[in-house]
Amino acid sequence: MQICLMDETGATDGALSVLAARWGLEHDEDNPMALVLTPQHLELRKRDEPKLGGIFVDFVGGAMAHRRKFGGGRGEAVAKAVGIKGDYLPDVVDATAGLGRDAFVLASVGCRVRMLERNPVVAALLDDGLTRGYADADIGPWLQQRLQLIHASSLTALTDITPRPQVVYLDPMFPHRQKSALVKKEMRVFQSLVGPDLDADGLLEPARQLATKRVVVKRPDYAPPLADVATPNAIVTKGHRFDIYAGTPLTE
């Protein structure tokens, strides 16, 4: 994949070349998207809209730390949707990891989560965030146990992941109507990079075959159900729906 690669660390250790080789990235000087190694983190920028700033994954500070400390925890809609109850903390595959926010919420309340991400740039951002998270004295010990990244296409990976998870979580990219600054900024940068998930409808059936308990699909409230498969089971929040489908139980 081609993208503009930039190193702002001032170091001469070749870290950017190593990163490019690992994720299969080729430097393209004229690409409007840039992956930038800063002294603090790896970030994605839209070069023709510099005011949008950089997007990076941060599990340790910022909004994620606030959500972990002061958010609803088990009361969050995503936690309810995957079925967390009492001692039951399902094993989850997040097949559309993105920036890892929902996966992190589930991990922070005790679930083991395997994140799938097919876009190499997004996977590199996630990996960078995980590396910093794993090294953090506060969250590192449990984050290493509960949150993992698999760089693979969900369409193929969903058929051969073992062991099978109890829950598969899907949050395909869907054009956002909201005008909130954060969503607008992130979506503009993100959609410039990856575009909409045109093949997302193809994820529902393999997800249902893989999950032993349920599949949860996050949708904007105005979006049709994934693959036009309606379900009476949903958790509705302001602006979103978590549609719930039955999985395929383990056979003895």
UniProtKB/Swiss-Prot annotation:
Gene3D superfamilies: Vaccinia Virus protein VP39, YhiQ-like domain. CDD domains: AdoMet_MTases. Its EC number is 2.1.1.242. It is found in: Cytoplasm. InterPro entries: 16SrRNA_methylTrfase_J, SAM-dependent_MTases_sf. GO terms for molecular function: rRNA (guanine-N2-)-methyltransferase activity. HAMAP family: 16SrRNA_methyltr_J. This is Ribosomal RNA small subunit methyltransferase J. It comes from Salmonella schwarzengrund (strain CVM19633). The gene is rsmJ.
